Amino acid sequence: MIKYTLGSTSLATVRGQEDYTQRIKNMEISIDEWSQIKNNIDYIGVTENFKDVITTFSTDPNQTPAGFRRELVLDGNVLKVDLVRDISYDSDGELRPTNVLFSADSANPYEIVPMKNLISNLTCNPGIVYDLFINNPEANIGNQFKDRDEVMTEIAKILGPGVDISVELNNPFEKNFDTILEEAEKFKNMFSKHRVVIKVPHTGVVTSENVNELMLEDKKLSRDFKNVSTEDSFYSHNLCLKLREAGYRINYTLMFEPYQTNLALQAKPYFINTFLRQRLVQSETIQNYVKIYDLTKDITILKNLRQY
């Protein structure tokens, strides 16, 4: 089987773009694409986005960086190559080894180093940054890192271009949306627009008025999940939509039920983090209570089940 590449078309390069096109000469094309190119195209070049990606990430001068899919764009008599963000791709537009992409949930730079070439996404939130790393002397060796920005800047240096970084807003209930945008902009500057993903929690019954109840000893809300206004129910959904309109990709997280996930998709997130294991554990616990009651007919078992 004959392999056709952009390099085999012998197209002239757009003047001044030789260093860019050197990276894509090995890009494979179909025989139909090759025929169309030979008969209709005079030059080969790259898009402005392609240039921005290469400028952002210093990589081998003969390669395109991981985390991007190569696409052909026709512009008059010029065939341009674009780099589209897609973490299922390794360097040079090659697919990763499997369809399963791995994500790490960590804010420990020392922990991230050995896995940096195996993951395609990293998630972290303020709690992980401070509780599990900065304020943990066993993890934050020599108290080297003092605040969240220092940690995230170091993580950005460690991870390559092929890894998205999902970082959670410090206060998703901030009433001033411009303040939220300022925080998102700061992370975009740290990670680049190509890697940053803003993590938004599914709030549901949790609001700015009762969120502090989750920090108390029993970590329970004083009202049940049905006691919530329609506006509060869809607060985080609308926050996702607003951030998306502002140009950010969203990691919508903290769903515990399948039906929540289906509705969350209407907010057009880039990622969904759904904790179905929690529902599995609860279902198995309920099933166990029922089995014990069937065997013992002990009424206290039913009382414990209701409390659960």
What are these regions (language model features)?
Residues E94-R96, F191, L241:
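Solvent-exposed alpha-helices and their adjacent loops that cap or buttress functional pockets
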Residues M215-L241, A246-Y308:
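Catalytic alpha/beta core domains of metabolic enzymes, predominantly
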Residues M1-N99:
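Long, compositionally biased, glycine/small-hydrophobic-enriched stretches that function as flexible linkers
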Residues F68-L83, T98, S103-F234:
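Active-site beta->alpha loop and helix N-cap motifs at the rims of alpha/beta catalytic domains
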Residues D90-G93, A107, L221, K242-L243:
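A generic structural signal for ordered alpha-helices
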Residues T56-T64, K188-L214, P269-K297:
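Repeat-unit-sized solenoid/scaffold elements
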Residues I24-F68, E209-E231, V290-Y308:
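Charged, glycine/proline-rich intrinsically disordered loops and linkers
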